[in-house]
Amino acid sequence: MAKGQSLQDPFLNALRRERVPVSIYLVNGIKLQGQIESFDQFVILLKNTVSQMVYKHAISTVVPSRPVSHHSNNAGGGASNNYHHGSNAQGSTAQQDSEETE
């Protein structure tokens, strides 16, 4: 369990700390938008006009509105190649291009 959260915790924490607006897509297709207020092992508190508790098992995708640096503790840098937002210059452009083609 700790290995799986070693990726999601720094990512979610960076989004929370920097107050980055996010779109959260649920497995049923619903899109939620807001800022991550807090999170734990099972839920994310998403704040917009109201706070919503979203269970992680219902989440398909978390999409930040801008690239976020969440690899500050990664000395090797190898794992960052697995993420679209690992490169600050290209991440948001690639995301916008993929959204336009849908």
Curated annotation (Swiss-Prot):
Residues 63-102 are annotated as: Disordered. Transmembrane segments: none annotated. Disruption phenotype: Drastically decreases survival in host macrophages. Cells display drastically reduced virulence in vitro and in vivo. Mice infected with the deletion mutant show no signs of illness during the course of the experiment. Keywords: RNA-binding, Stress response, Virulence. Gene3D superfamilies: 2.30.30.100. Disulfide bonds: none annotated. One of its GO terms (biological process) is regulation of DNA-templated transcription. The keyword Zinc does not apply. Residues 70-88 have a biased composition (Low complexity). One of its GO terms (molecular function) is identical protein binding. Residues 9-68 form the Sm domain. Hfq expression was decreased during the space flight and expression of 64 genes of the hfq regulon was altered. Likewise, several small RNAs that interact with hfq were differentially regulated during the flight. Homohexamer. Belongs to the Hfq family. NCBIfam families: Hfq, PRK00395.1. RNA chaperone that binds small regulatory RNA (sRNAs) and mRNAs to facilitate mRNA translational regulation in response to envelope stress, environmental stress and changes in metabolite concentrations. Also binds with high specificity to tRNAs. Plays a central regulatory role in the microbial response to space flight conditions. Is essential for virulence and is required for efficient invasion of non-phagocytic cells. This is RNA-binding protein Hfq. It comes from Salmonella typhimurium (strain LT2 / SGSC1412 / ATCC 700720).
